[in-house]
Amino acid sequence: MACRTVGISDSVYRYRPDPHRDDEVIAKLQEAVERYPAYGFGKLFKILRRWGHPWNHKRVYRLYCTLGLNKRRRGKKRLPSRHPEPLAVPGQANHCWSMDFMSDSLFCGRRFRTFNLVEDFNREALAIEIDLNLPAQRVIRVLERVVAWRGYPNKLRMDNGPEFISATLAEWAEEHGIELEFIKPGKPTQNSYVERFNRTYRDEILNMYVFRTLNEVRELTENWIREYNEERPHDSLEDLTPWEYLDKHEKLENSNLACH
């Protein structure tokens, strides 16, 4: 009678919140954070969706904040370029690969280098070679290794580093009909695909761990490449992973060919 007087139903009056209602959401959110510690909320929410959980965005974010995950330490924010030079997106794979070098150090202080190779079309990590020294001949060996399963690209984009402007690489590229495109000095935005990839790799691997040996770097990097290509959704790829995006377009091309 009292409920009818104030205009609420008996079920609403008797409602008691379930203290364990969010347990599964919290468990899966913590699992995602543990597996992808460098991801922010947006990426983590997409991971939960990819795992098949249809939970409401606001609900997940509320729990994300309740757990204090929004207060995790972040790296320095990179100031946006005043005059960005967006690269054209290739219409197919093997049109252009971008490559670059990075450097870091082991726990003992010894420096090492990484040679990073990225497919512009689907942002796929084609290779990361790691060693104390990576001369031009070593770069060519990595390229040949990738070419063996991927085919030759039409073009390679790079900066003017000594390994890239060497006659050895120029002769190899000419032999296989590959154009070498050098960006202008001081213009990293002209190689933005691999630059963005480098930042992600540094945030999630190089800055995340202390390495005692090169083999530790290689093992962690190999696992990260698999996750990056197979599990990580990309905003620029319709929230697909690099391999999913490539597979989608290969199927589309095959269906178009079948129609002609």
Task: Please annotate each region the language model reported.
Residues 1-260:
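Charged DNA-binding/catalytic regions of mobile-element recombinases
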